Amino acid sequence: MSDVKLHRLYIHGQYTDATSGKTFDSINPATGEVIATIQQASQTDIEAAVKSAAEGQKVWAAKTAVERSRILRRAVDILRERNDELAQLETLDTGKAFSETSTVDIVTGADVLEYYAGLATAIQGEQVPLRESSFFYTRREPLGVVAGIGAWNYPIQIALWKSAPALAAGNAMIFKPSEVTPLTAFKLAEIYSEAGLPAGVFNVVQGAGREIGQWLTEHAVIEKISFTGGVETGKKVMASAAGSTLKEVTMELGGKSPLIICEDANLDRAADIAVMANFFSSGQVCTNGTRVFIPQRLKAAFEQAVVERVKRIRMGDPQHTDTNFGPLVSFPHMEKVLSYIESGKQQGAKVLIGGERATTGLLAQGAYVQPTVFTDCHDDMKIVQEEIFGPVMSILTYDTIEEAIERANNTNFGLAAGVVTQNISQAHQIIHQLEAGICWINTWGESPAEMPVGGYKESGVGRENGISTLNHYTRTKSIQVELGDYQSVF
């Protein structure tokens, strides 16, 4: 334990000791080893972070949009220069393969920051004439202090998705990463400070969501909460935010997304998409297409194509560059996923491949679960209805496309959906009927900075990324001007 680094909170541009006296450990899920000990924030520390953010936000908002953009662009450059260093830390903390974190997590996070750095100068109001002697104009003003609460599956990417539009609009952010993957948020805070962000504009507090999250959502000074996580927790955050000071919220929550493969689909392409939609990042992606609908007559050929591809997955040490499938994020999460797999077996689904914990050699030390494909699934099965957040695909057959659409929509979730077909007209007709916020045709999973991300139904409120997100980090002030005489009715 003497070699394990102790991490403090990051408040007002520097590391500072928490006052709670409590700590928690970050565990490498590939080995079970403790890699860091993190101090947990107290309510006193949250107050200090809010006070710091309020002070820093005034300095930040007073800068011109060009100045803010310049500082954020510097941060982008530093992120890209340190891509591999950050990716190695992310892999250590999350268990995700370095081949993934080095090409996706930091890269796409930096892309979003660069996108909003460019949009910082485009935040503007409008002027509208009312009559010859009067007009009104609007100002887009920052909210002030906002809070971001991150999830454990894309720690630094989520921190950037939340902080980039907030900072571009002139706000300060207090960010709480998941206690399961707490480390790269510290590095992002350091990078922001190095780039020239004023002290307090990006603070990092650590600890359990049920405590820290509640203090943030109920704080009177905090004007907005952006949360990524599970549906039930999201409902509590939203209720708390509404019950305190009626804060604005953005919620990116869970999913159980359908992937519909049409009669005319190229099965090789369909199998490629289905495997990527289920096993990328070891299946720990909110938008995963875990309900795969296939026409009955194509079932056997599709299953064979999927199994062939799953056999090519390279599970192993996530730090090795040839590994493309690492452990799950934690041992408790592994047990949860294994319990879902057991449920699938008990309810009569057939395991085509996988279905167990991976225990060969050094894999036994980590939270590894075999990529698992179930077939002969039914809509009422637990593995089909509930979000597993692991490497578990469920194959379901259908007779008509109308049936597939109806069943695809028969869920409380509505995060993502996809269609594979060679008939582009049919693709659009199907997509327009699917109740989901993020949809893909003949592909899966890409989320460019320009594309809004968010769900329907219980999968979320509001959007992240895209131009419109900036509107939710500002508020509009309307000002009428009268140039002529003023006539009172009294």
Swiss-Prot record:
The active site is at residues 162, 252, 286, 464. GO terms for biological process: glycine betaine biosynthetic process from choline. Signal peptide: none annotated. InterPro entries: Ald_DH/histidinol_DH, Ald_DH_C, Ald_DH_CS_CYS, Ald_DH_CS_GLU, Ald_DH_N, Aldehyde_DH_dom, BADH. Keywords: Metal-binding, NAD, NADP, Oxidation, Oxidoreductase, Potassium. GO terms for molecular function: betaine-aldehyde dehydrogenase (NAD+) activity; metal ion binding. This is Betaine aldehyde dehydrogenase. Its cofactor is K(+). Pfam families: Aldedh (PF00171).
